[in-house]
């Protein structure tokens, strides 16, 4: 098992009116705290997982091939999420699991109004009304958010996963408590299975 984590120099939104030399160290300190939490859990649960730091745009060959890759609320935080997903697909033999925030109000409304009909119906309604789409989140007028680039709909991720060889997928939804803002956040999870054999060059 390998835990692949962003280095402290992750993709921050380069607002021209903000001094990166001031807020970048604060962000690095925040990342260090997250890393400390990882090591605490690693110790308490006697985990044998190896932690590797790096960029999601160039996962090193030393990581090797894996059966399953999970990306938990990471794609919204990188400048080029599709390249990141492509890198994960390159080393994954069987299944990719993507969990992310469903933070577009139109999408939340569809889930609230039609959720009782079941995931399959919600999926058809969402695809008909919204389709695969992406929203650019940074707003120069307010200088926020500093570390979130995109809202990526599950339909977009599903289609791209099919492009990189994971054509059998299912989408589910759940609510997760977000302690920082003391509220429940609607999330989606895509479980996609490889349908196109890995290229020999990768093996």
Where in the sequence are the language-model features?
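Conserved SAM-binding loop
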Residues: 1-17, 21-107, 154-158, 192-194
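S-adenosyl-L-methionine-dependent methyltransferase catalytic module, highlighting the catalytic core
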Residues: 57-58, 70, 79-200
């Amino acid at each position: 098992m390998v835990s692949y984590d962003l280095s402290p120099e992750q993709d921050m939104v380069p607002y021209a009116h903000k001094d990166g030399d001031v807020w970048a160290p604060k962000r690095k300190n925040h990342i260090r705290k997250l890393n400390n939490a990882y090591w605490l859990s690693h110790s308490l649960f006697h985990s044998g997982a190896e932690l590797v730091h790096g960029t999601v745009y160039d996962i090193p060959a030393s990581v090797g091939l894996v059966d399953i890759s999970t990306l938990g609320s990471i794609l919204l935080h990188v400048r080029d999420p599709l390249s990141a997903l492509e890198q994960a697909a390159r080393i994954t033999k069987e299944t990719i699991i993507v969990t992310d925030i469903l933070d577009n109000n139109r999408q939340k409304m569809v889930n609230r109004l039609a959720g009782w009909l079941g995931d399959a119906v919600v999926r058809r309604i969402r695809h008909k009304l919204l389709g695969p789409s992406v929203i650019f989140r940074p707003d120069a007028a307010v200088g926020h958010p500093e570390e979130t680039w995109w809202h990526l709909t599950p339909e977009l991720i599903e289609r791209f996963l099919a492009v990189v060889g994971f054509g059998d997928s299912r989408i589910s939804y759940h609510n997760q408590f977000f302690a920082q803002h003391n509220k429940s956040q609607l999330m989606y999870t895509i479980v996609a299975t490889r349908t196109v054999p890995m290229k020999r060059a990768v093996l």
